Amino acid sequence: MAHGCSGGAMSRFVFLGVALALLGGATSPAAAAPRVTPVVVDVDDYGADPTGRTDSTPAVAAALRHAKSVDRPVRIVFSKGTYQLYPERAETRELYMSNTVGADQRYRDKKIGLLVEDMHDVTVDGGGAKLVHHGLQTAFASIRSTDVTFQNFSFDYAAPEVIDATVATTGVTDGHAYRVLKIPAGSPYRVNGTHITWLGETSPATGQPYWSGVDGLQYTQIHDPEAQRTWRGDNPLFNDVAAVTDLGGRRIRIDYTTAARPADAGLVYQMRLIERTEPGAFIWESKNVTMRSMNAYYLQSFGVVGQFSENISIDKVNFAPDPRSGRSTASFADFVQMSGVKGKVSITRSLFDGPHDDPINIHGTYLEVVGKPGPSTLTLAYKHPQTAGFPQFAPGDEVEFATKRTMTPLADAHAQVTAVDGPSGMDHTKPLTTMTVTFDRPVPAGVETGGTVVENITATPSVVISGNVFRNVPTRGILVTTRKPVLITGNRFDGMSMASIYVSADAYQWYESGPVADLTIRGNSFTRPSGPVIFVEPTNQVIDPATPVHHNISVEHNSFDIGDVTVVNAKSVGGFAFTGNTVRRLDGADHPPYTSPLFVFHGSSGIRIARNHYDKGLNTSVVTD
């Protein structure tokens, strides 16, 4: 099979393909043209090292550059080995993305280990390879490309920007409490007196660590491997420290001035910094992008960001730590964040285990009106510091104007964009937090500076989330706010620490848009959930049942195995059905009855609750106001 390394071989390959096509056409003039056989580009032919002994970054970049020059479908293939990818010679691009570091110029240049850019009909097939990324970099990206598939490989980071410290033992010696921590390989550290400095792997180029931090870093969550639960909480490891001793073998003893024996043996303290300096993977201005049959063992600094793209599919991807690593964290923050995507988002048959934020978040962005330079023109601004620097609108897009206080559309609320002057997503020559947008008609009456937000409703997807498993999640399971049809079906949620499914629409904090109009939650299982299990909470300050924010939510044929929690808490919904569901108690009917009402509604109408099965001892009250 041709590998695209020899010009002569390539010419013969192309000629043979043309000849076969002509022969097929001669025998059947009306037949459709056969699919063009893709050119195969093997990264090993460019010097990539599947033994994992040397840096494969330059070779992988060279293979991708060659693949880009091939004017036909292409498969980029790896051997079934281990490839090391360092950031020093990775492709570098100035990029801005949603929910990361906004316009912060310290982080504008992103290193990308595997970059598909301005390409069409390309498959990156790992063939069972493992890609090990070093330092702070994005594992892979698709930028301005179409028909892109990433498949059949695992990726991990040699030194994750998270420390998973397991409390191996606790005790008391001479009246002083102590803990012994076990630290996974890939988390270098140095003991300095009564402190620990965490060192994020040494760069071979500079001799300095890629990142560093002290003691509990900036954020902690706690994982209980036995109970299979993870939650956000305080970090007691570095309080009242008397001494820190490196015992060797990646074990650290911390002695305390206090006397009470710590009661947290077996727990894992997952500690990290808070700057989301780059996404783990990035899909931007691309169409028909698929991630399939992959192990995402860790996502550095953030998750997979899909941004202003069309049709994204994630199928059979294990977002979970490598079981051989000794780690319990698989993402610095979210696993999947879809921002301003159109077409269809499909997330199926995947595992979400061990994030530091929400596994799936699908939303748009509200831009706030900050100026009216003309009758048909507005100045709009990003309002959350983590999101800035990239375009939100293009000529031809349809927008909707909404009032912040009510979160409902203005009268005559839609217009079409005709011109945009704002950030490009790739450079800092223009202001990164504001843009001027011109529409095809005068802006509607009622648009107010500081009181109106604008959403790009062209860049909203239909969504299918099916057949997935969510566990060891410290936050919500799924966040979704899109006006297109959403189906959440056949998923298993176990031990969520916040709402399993959360629907917001937020014009006050995160500015994540917008309303849902057709949401079906069907055939899922919710086990050991926190309450409320399904939480609808738009940020409207004025609540009027006659003008709800969200519409047409159906919860049907699901099973809920719960403690004493509320199943549904919904605000500002017009049309909510809860039918054919089974709600069971976790502790059995011989225990005292639960007191939490199963259903709470605020400012909602069209509520239908019917044909459900409830265990005895549940509070089936429906609370409305």
From Swiss-Prot:
The lineage of its organism: Bacteria, Bacillati, Actinomycetota, Actinomycetes, Kitasatosporales. It catalyses: Hydrolysis of terminal, non-reducing branched (1->3)-alpha-D-galactosidic residues, producing free D-galactose; Hydrolysis of terminal, non-reducing alpha-D-galactose residues in alpha-D-galactosides, including galactose oligosaccharides, galactomannans and galactolipids. Alpha-galactosidase that specifically removes branched alpha-1,3-linked galactose residues present in blood group B antigens. Has no activity toward linear alpha-1,3-linked galactose residues. Belongs to the glycosyl hydrolase 110 family. A subfamily. InterPro entries: Beta-barrel_GLAA-B_II (IPR056441), PbH1 (IPR006626), Pectin_lyas_fold (IPR012334), Pectin_lyase_fold/virulence (IPR011050), RHGA/B-epi-like_pectate_lyase (IPR024535). The keyword rRNA processing does not apply. GO terms for molecular function: alpha-galactosidase activity. PbH1 repeats lie at residues 342-364, 460-482, 483-505, 516-537, 573-611. This is Alpha-1,3-galactosidase A. Keywords: Glycosidase, Hydrolase, Repeat, Signal. The keyword Repeat applies. Residues 1-32 form the signal peptide. Its EC number is 3.2.1.n1, 3.2.1.22.
